[in-house]
Amino acid sequence: MAAMVNAADAPDAEVPYENQSSWTDRLEISVGLTEDLEPTISALTVQPLQQDADGRNTVFTQLSHFSYEQFDDRKNTTNLGLGFRNVSEDNSLLIGANIFYDYEWEEGHQRLGFGLEAKMDRLEFTLNFYDAISDEKAIDANVDELALDGYDVTLRTQLPYMPWATLGLQYYEWDSIDFDDIEGTKISLDMNLTENMDLELGLSDDNDSDSTIFANFTYNFGGNSSRPNMSDGYDTEAFVTGSDMRDHNLDKVRRQNKIITERDSSGVTISRKN
């Protein structure tokens, strides 16, 4: 996460802004598990392409690769993203837009993604749309597989007195071709364990399958010594206020990086959720 001079220290002057110089400072590795114990392993980085000296306008790229289990097969998907973020003059609000290209290597599925986001004290909002652009793929003589269109909307907020913990609530929908659309919700708790390590715990539930408990462990190589973490304990104030959103202009875009697919086997459609 970026380092900066607090706006409160220089209220009448243009505040200089600095970013970490090493690209590895914005590299993270994640391992995720669900109840079936099949791991999702990923690497993700966010890098600035162009940024104003005051840090209020940022063009960035987000690159990631995910390896995960789907239909009892190991899938690998690469995500290439381009985004723009703007921070308000008082540094209290960040708004952004992004576009992604997703490619799944095993079957050649392709997808475009479009996203909007807004961040302020105690609250984050993201809206993502997913548009599959590849044709149906023949897995074998009797099985076809198709990437699905969809969207998700997410709200995240800090928990009272715990600035190192964030509660997230997401609604998602995937457009099935032959059966009912997949509609579901996801609730999660994201905790900063240390300046480098995060733990996310959650529950996903939809009309396609049983509820699923999940956990994601993330290690960030750069870390951030100024961000609150669990060892700080509880805060004396319910919510942190006065945050400078320029600290978040190189946060990762939160989206579904896996390509969700549907299989048709001898007339029976099988779907896979988040």
Where in this protein do the model-derived segments appear?
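Residues on the lipid-exposed face of transmembrane beta-strands in outer-membrane beta-barrel proteins
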Residues: 43-47, 80-84, 99, 114-120, ...
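Transmembrane beta-strands of outer-membrane beta-barrel pores
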Residues: 31-37, 63-71, 84-86, 101-105, ...
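Short beta-alpha junctions and helix-cap segments that line functional grooves
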Residues: 110-114, 201-203
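Repeated loop/turn-to-beta-strand initiation elements of outer-membrane beta-barrel proteins
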Residues: 51-60, 87-97, 122-127, 161-169, ...
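Residues that define the transmembrane beta-barrel architecture of outer-membrane proteins
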Residues: 23-25, 37-43, 57, 74-80, ...
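Flexible, glycine-rich linker and terminal segments associated
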Residues: 8-19, 133-168, 174-179, 192-200, ...
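Outer-membrane beta-barrel initiation region
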Residues: 5-73, 248-254, 258-274
